[in-house]
Amino acid sequence: MAEMSKNPASTLKPSRYLCLTICGYRKPGMSEEDYRYHMTQVSAPMTKDLMAKYGVKRWTMNYMIRRWPSCPTLTASAKLCLRTLEDYKRMKQDPWYKEHLIGDHEKFADTKRSKMTIGWIEEWISDGKPVDGLEFKS
């Protein structure tokens, strides 16, 4: 077993990418199926090119299939990999984002309940193989 450093936090460098996680809730009265349909067929197609323009390297959605006591009403979580939080902030200031996406979110999401976390992302297995960090081709 590897020996633990006396002060491991002092020797760690941040990973190259941040992961912004958005915990999303569907609008009251909307079914989970309708939420997922709107996200995959309307919102995601409108959003993905803008995210790529502002440096998002990966965007995934996880739709809940089982409820946990810690978050019994969570509908989905979105994960965005990016280099800096500033890239995300710039995207939200884009006139196209303001004109098209803010209003779209109100059609399917309970935005008052949404929550976000941000942290460094590490990757240890990719495509079924052990790796030593997250890398993107471009």
From Swiss-Prot:
Listed GO MF terms: monooxygenase activity
E.C. designation(s): 1.-.-.-
EthD domain ranges (all copies): 28-111
Gene3D superfamilies: 3.30.70.100
Pfam families (alphabetical): EthD
Listed pathway(s): Secondary metabolite biosynthesis
InterPro entries found in the cross-reference section: Dimeric_a/b-barrel, EthD_dom
Enzyme kind, highest EC tier: oxidoreductase
Annotated family: Belongs to the tpcK family.
Reported function: Probable decarboxylase; part of the gene cluster that mediates the biosynthesis of pestheic acid, a diphenyl ether which is a biosynthetic precursor of the unique chloropupukeananes. The biosynthesis initiates from condensation of acetate and malonate units catalyzed by the non-reducing PKS ptaA. As the ptaA protein is TE/CLC domain-deficient, hydrolysis and Claisen cyclization of the polyketide could be catalyzed by ptaB containing a beta-lactamase domain.
Name of the molecule in the record: Probable decarboxylase ptaD
Organism, scientific name: Pestalotiopsis fici (strain W106-1 / CGMCC3.15140)
Gene responsible for this protein: ptaD
